[in-house]
């Protein structure tokens, strides 16, 4: 249910009115209060899942939700205070539940603590809201649900964009020019640790690789990999960064962040992806967070090694994907110590790079094709599973 209409569309709940809302909601979540359109509506349309939209000035249907899309969870904001009083009356009476939809993977325990405190301030039962999170730990929490948002997000960017099928790399049998692809647009210290070590050890000579200089305020003291355990690594890493940015394509900075833009040769001319995920430990939550970075490799016919949260491969298996366990060492995924997981992942990489890349790719081919087909398929069942969890 929504408070406002915009032509024939609902206007996102709690969002300030844009200068030209009749054109597009693009960029809505980029500024305070970081409210964004609820992506679920787009996904329901993409995959033909039934979704009834109504407004708070109409009769409230049974089991109705009031969706609030979050581009970023801001702990300084009292989200409940932003809800119109007439809508809040329905929530207080139990006729309507708030549904926070958050596609990011930061710590959901902290978000629950904040929202439960706000419930107490406003005299609301904690059962007045549900929270959808991109962090897998959400499934272990009361009133929280995990949803693989980025799988469906990249589907609508990589499979079918604005009603048109998108190009993608194929699992061809021809020799390829590079062993692997490893891309990083945004600088984070843990990513710099990994890529600089590849660089120092001469592992990038047969790779498509990049390391950008876009910064988001990441602090070296927050690096989840303990640099003190590697003599001289920090100084060599800083030297590596001073030579950047490093590029492997001709795309602009804007195109690098446009998920429907594909430099196809980075996948069709290399054998696998070493994925530098968005988060490495998901704010000590114990959960995993999988983004389009991983799904881009899957869609474009690449097997993968993932530098990311523990449990990332396990989550992919739970989603139905194959993680090439018969063809490379994937035991790193179960290691919770961030530094040890980094060491074990590097060991798996080095073992893989000793193999005949072409022969190894052919061994993986059936699983590559299986994963690609699974990703391209309808996500109706994903949405149905989410609806089922929210109805409990």
Where does each model-flagged region fall?
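Pol beta-like nucleotidyltransferase catalytic core
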Residues: 1-275, 281-291, 295-392
């Amino acid at each position: 249910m929504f408070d406002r209409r915009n032509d024939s569309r609902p206007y996102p709940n709690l969002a300030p009115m844009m200068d030209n809302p009749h054109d597009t909601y693009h960029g809505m979540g980029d500024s305070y209060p970081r409210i964004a359109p609820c992506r679920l509506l787009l996904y329901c349309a993409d995959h033909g899942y039934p979704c009834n939209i109504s407004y708070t000035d109409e009769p409230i249907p049974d089991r109705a939700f009031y969706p609030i899309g979050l581009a970023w969870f801001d702990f300084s904001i009292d989200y409940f205070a932003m809800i119109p009083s007439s809508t809040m009356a329905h929530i207080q009476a139990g006729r309507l539940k708030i549904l926070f939809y958050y596609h990011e993977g930061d710590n959901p325990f902290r978000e629950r603590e904040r929202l439960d405190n706000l419930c107490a301030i406003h005299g609301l039962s904690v059962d007045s809201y549900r929270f959808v999170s991109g962090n897998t730990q959400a499934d272990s929490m009361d009133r929280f649900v995990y949803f693989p948002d980025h799988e469906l997000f990249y589907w609508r960017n990589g499979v079918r964009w604005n009603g048109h099928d998108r190009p993608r790399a194929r699992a061809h049998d021809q020799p390829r020019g590079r062993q692997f692809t490893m891309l990083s647009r945004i600088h984070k210290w843990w990513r710099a640790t990994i890529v600089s070590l590849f660089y120092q050890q001469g592992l990038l000579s047969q790779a498509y690789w990049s390391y950008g200089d876009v910064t988001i305020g990441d602090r070296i003291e927050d690096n989840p990999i303990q640099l003190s355990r590697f003599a001289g690594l920090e100084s060599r890493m800083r030297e590596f960064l001073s030579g950047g940015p490093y590029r492997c394509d001709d795309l602009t900075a804007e195109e690098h962040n446009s998920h429907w833009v594909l430099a196809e040769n980075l996948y069709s001319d290399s054998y696998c992806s070493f994925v530098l995920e968005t988060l490495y430990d998901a704010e000590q939550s114990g959960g995993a967070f999988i983004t389009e970075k991983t799904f881009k490799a899957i869609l474009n016919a690449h097997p993968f090694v993932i530098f990311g949260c523990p449990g990332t491969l396990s989550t992919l298996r739970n989603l139905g994907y194959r993680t090439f366990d018969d063809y490379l060492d994937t035991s790193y995924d179960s290691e919770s110590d961030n530094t040890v997981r980094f060491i074990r992942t590097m060991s798996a990489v080095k073992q893989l790079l000793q193999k005949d890349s072409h022969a190894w790719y052919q061994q993986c081919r059936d699983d590559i094709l299986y994963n690609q087909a699974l990703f391209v398929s309808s996500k109706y069942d994903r949405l149905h599973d989410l609806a089922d969890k929210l109805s409990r």
